[in-house]
Amino acid sequence: MRIAVVGIGGVGGFYGGKLALAYAGKREHDVIFIARGEHLQAIRKKGLCLITPEGETLTVVPTLATDRSEEVGTLDIVLFCTKSYGLEESARMITENVHDGTVVLPLLNGVNITERLRKVLPGCTVLNGCVYIGSNIEGPGVVHHKGGTGQLFFGPDRKEDIEKFRYLEDLLRGAGIKADLVEDVAVQVWTKYIFVSSFAGITSLRGKTFGAVLENDEDRKMLQGLMAEIEAVAKAKGMHLPADIVEESLRKGASFPYATKTSMQLDYEKGRPTEIDIFME
């Protein structure tokens, strides 16, 4: 199969890196990185440097790294790992590379990503998905996985279709990715949204890390309040969430390293565009 990872940032670098380490250069699969700028040039020259939480450095060489759709060829699986504000542009780039059998798996933050992709790629099968990882670009060609288990949840809208995508779960797990094909994927996406939207907002507002926010009573109460508000929105939309979703989200935040920052906080601190649109929608 021909697998493309669109966006080789913190998320795409980790999951794309895992896939390329396992499958690139093998007869059965091609793993293609779609990136841009200095990051792309560095990957082309030296491969992607993926740093693990333990400090180990892995060199990842994909089958192809490019920013040109004409070099990509026909794709069977596409993982979208871009920022939300670049989603449609990135999807339009590969419209000539996908077909009716192409499976698209977005790993972005947000609760409307699948719908947005289906508008641009109506002939593809677009699944829903979310991930838990603390990872970011440290420099051109370098991605550092700092924390989080790397857990990936994904699935189709209809639970009756779940077995059609068991092969994708096997493919991801074969690359050492903690992937679970689930029937309640919308609940998983909202659960992630409650977690990441709240932490992104409060850490960016306060200019603090996960650990610093959680140990401050005022910040923690603000975090809890924001989580409860998003929980209420999810329930109003018909989501059946666990009763302890707020407490579990706080526990999840505490499982990350003290110095963890959200991608929105990192972007805000560096003066780059942020994903505030999806966090405050």
Predicted feature residues:
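A structural signal for isolated positions on well-ordered beta-strands in alpha/beta enzyme cores
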Residues: 4, 30-32, 105, 127, ...
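Internal alpha-helical scaffold of NAD(P)-dependent oxidoreductase catalytic cores
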Residues: 23, 96-97, 119-125, 138-247, ...
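Short, charged/polar "capping" segments at the starts of alpha-helices
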Residues: 39-42, 114-115, 162
